[in-house]
Amino acid sequence: RIDKGQCPSVDFVHLNVLLREPNYRNDVLMRVEANGTPELQALAREIMANDDGRPLMAKSSNQKLQASPVTPQKRRGWFARHALVLVPVIGTVVATVAGFTAFENRNVRISADITADTVWESGHRYTLENTVFVEGANLTIEPGVTIEGEPGSALVVTSSAKLFARGSRNQPVVFTSSKEPGARARGDWGGVVLLGKAPVNEPNARIEGVPENDTRGQFGGSDTQHSCGVVQYTRIEFAGFEVYQNNELNGLTLGGCGSNTIIQNVQVHRALDDGIEMFGGTVDLKNILVTGAADDSIDWDWGWRGRVQFAIIQQYRDVGDNAFEGDNNGSSHSAVPRSEPTFYNVTLYGSGRSAKEHRAIMLREGSGGHFHNMIIDSYAIEALDTRDEVTALVGMNALTFSHNLLANNGRLGNLTIVNETDDDDFGFNEELWIRSPELQNTVQVETGLQPSVTSESSPHFRPRSSVRAMTAKRPPKAEFFDESAMYQGAVNPRATSTWLDDWTAFPES
């Protein structure tokens, strides 16, 4: 609420609505004219006399205000009055009269669990004081909202609830540290956890970070189409506090989320543990960016069978492990449903030789997967490491790897593995498999990405090669996939703008 001011009939004023909605603006000004101080009454009358009844700000990022069909002289007078009259009215009537500055951009502290439908509104900041559970309710987060996590905090959306974090290209939802810019670091807070009712292959599955006797951490079921909600145009920064020794939360955790969950245009930046981890489920990911994760960038376990298109992993030189780490089930490698995700149009960048060297893809414990139209670039250890039983997975078509560009990997730049004798995969030879002519993979020494990919503050992920020079596979015919993406990597070489523009960010701290 806004403090009472010099106009008793105006309890509070919403600035965005005032600018966007002429009827609302007129109502506020009429109340000020009727009940305000003489000075404010005069200001209200003057602005009403010059107001042409049009919105003063677009209602959405896609809407453009149309110019009023007036003469140039009248238009100059109208905009002059906006500058000289409307702004003081907003500044005086809204800020002085109603204490508006305490309303817009106010900080709302959250400590209690959410058990009824709740909206976190644009123009506000919300601070998580501890681990907040959403149970049996929908939490809606409007575009432009910033959620700051204090040490030890996290947002856990249980399987009985849904999260609708719908940002926009120009107003993303941002989950970040509560510390001031310049003082933020990995692990400042926990992260975002979504739990659902889709199949997992682990009995009595429960999420890490929730006490064993707390049933709110349970997830999984039989509903392959279950929805955990929508996370769209959203950034998650500086997450991953240590729950207990060597066990941290991920930036984004998806446990048993089904195919009706929408995870699209999401960046996870500088997480202390994994960027995104799936525990079973059938959730799909699209337009995903993971930058500077301190462990794996994308991790999966317990039977995840989702699809991914347009994903970028940028691993920083000083931290991180694998770009992808895929497991099925450590207790039973053949557990069903088997982990078998599908990837198209992915860029993995490993930063080359550095203090912390990386591996692009590690598959183990029975995980299958399908990897196509990928650029795997600058991994000092190796591009692919398979462990445990692999030959059977390839034979049953549960593991495929084709039409990929492998560039500048290994010690000499042209290897896909470190040393075949070191692999615990019962003699499966990744090198020979990848180089099989029928798979149409390309292995080259020189990098396949532009030099700016090395930047940690303003990276670009456009490939060097043209579309014509690429050997790509057409994505499957399905509503989820963009079938026109006949190129390798997550960024169209021909595009002048990309899906990364406007909403992503790369703060160091």
What residue ranges belong to the model's regions?
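Eukaryotic low-complexity, mixed-charge intrinsically disordered interaction/regulatory segments enriched
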Residues: 1-31
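Short coil/turn segments at secondary-structure boundaries
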Residues: 12-17, 43-47, 206, 246
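Short, charged early-sequence alpha-helical segments and their helix-coil boundaries
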Residues: 29-53
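N-terminal intrinsically disordered, acidic low-complexity segments at the extreme N-terminus
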Residues: 49-76
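N-terminal domain-start segments of secreted/luminal proteins
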Residues: 67-74, 88, 95-146
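N-terminal Sec-pathway targeting helices
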Residues: 76-88
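Intrinsically disordered, low-complexity serine/proline/glycine/threonine-rich regulatory regions
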Residues: 80-83, 99, 480, 508
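Extracellular beta-rich repeat passengers
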Residues: 105-121, 128-138, 152-160, 167, ...
